[in-house]
Curated annotation (Swiss-Prot):
NCBIfam families: rpmI_bact
The organism's place on the tree of life at top rank: Bacteria
SUPFAM superfamilies given in the database record: L35p-like
Family classification: Belongs to the bacterial ribosomal protein bL35 family.
UniProt-listed HAMAP family: Ribosomal_bL35
Key words, A-Z: Ribonucleoprotein, Ribosomal protein
Keyword DNA-binding found: no
UniProt GO cellular component terms: cytosolic large ribosomal subunit
Pfam families: Ribosomal_L35p
GO terms under biological process: translation
Protein name, UniProt field: Large ribosomal subunit protein bL35
Length: 65
């Protein structure tokens, strides 16, 4: 049986934690930042965990993670 290929775009976007969950960067911090408040930008800065509804999909993208 052939090996399952890793989805490379997902491999660049998600990192696995020690407990097996995935963390990701939040959206809305790439451009048009002048109209966003400093507080809004600061709250978007930290990485957050992938929601439980999306975990199975992300795991299928990264079979060897």
């Amino acid at each position: 049986m052939p090996k399952i290929k890793t989805l490379k775009s997902a491999a660049k976007r998600f990192k696995i934690t020690a407990s097996g969950k995935f963390k990701r960067k939040q959206a809305n911090l790439r451009h048009i930042l002048t109209k966003k408040t400093t507080t809004k930008k600061r709250h978007l800065r930290p990485k957050i965990l992938v929601s439980t509804g999306d975990m199975d999909r992300v795991k299928s993208f990264l079979p060897y993670a």
